[in-house]
């Protein structure tokens, strides 16, 4: 007698009903008719476990989007590698989306308004990548009055200023910096 036992399985086919996600628990996340998901930075607060409403941190909560090394900048969409994603900021192609060893996003949430994320099947206008598209939009409204802000936490600082120049012209300046080079960390 052999020490190995053979087991045979009989297939059983079971059909499940489809599940359609119509809304999310958090405001500002919407599924669009073109298959993309919209993240509105201005309409929502940070997700649980996040310090701020960062686009890349929030995107990792969506189905099909992960990161293998727990960094913000190495996002994988539907199993593709990070270099197979197209990341745009106001139509400008970005190749590096993080700093502090990829742990922090380069996008200041105070000047980003929303992001449109395609998890495969993006429009031909986005060509050039095979995994997914993250199309981030910045502030487009002319500020009504001068305002600004500063944010500090244990790993980074960010600041922004929004100033109207006229009725139809204004400017927005934003900066974000990690503390990696202070104290010999970088």
Model-derived features: where do they sit?
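A beta-strand signature from Gram-negative outer-membrane beta-barrel systems
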Residues: 7, 62, 106-147, 160
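Transmembrane beta-barrel domains of outer membrane proteins
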Residues: 10, 58, 78, 118, ...
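Short acidic/polar hinge/loop motifs at secondary-structure boundaries
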Residues: 46-48, 92-119
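Extracytoplasmic beta-strand/coil segments of soluble accessory domains associated
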Residues: 47, 56-93
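Residues that define the transmembrane beta-barrel architecture of outer-membrane proteins
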Residues: 53, 128-130, 153-157
């Amino acid at each position: 007698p052999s020490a190995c036992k053979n087991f045979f399985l009989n297939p059983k086919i079971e059909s499940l009903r489809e599940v359609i996600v119509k809304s999310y628990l958090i405001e500002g996340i919407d599924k669009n008719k073109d298959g993309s998901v919209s993240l509105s930075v201005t309409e929502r607060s940070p997700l649980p476990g996040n310090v701020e409403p960062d686009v890349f941190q929030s995107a990792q909560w969506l189905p099909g989007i992960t990161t293998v090394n727990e960094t913000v900048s190495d996002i994988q969409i539907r199993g593709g590698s990070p270099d197979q994603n197209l990341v745009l900021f106001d139509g400008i192609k970005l190749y590096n989306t993080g700093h502090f060893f990829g742990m922090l996003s380069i996008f200041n949430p105070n000047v980003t308004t929303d992001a449109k994320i395609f998890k495969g099947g993006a429009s031909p206008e986005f060509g050039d990548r095979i995994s997914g598209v993250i199309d981030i939009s910045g502030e487009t409204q002319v500020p009504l009055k001068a305002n600004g802000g500063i944010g500090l936490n244990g790993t980074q600082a960010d600041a922004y200023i929004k100033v109207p120049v006229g009725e139809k012209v204004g400017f927005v300046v934003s900066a974000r910096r990690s503390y990696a080079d202070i104290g010999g960390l970088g």
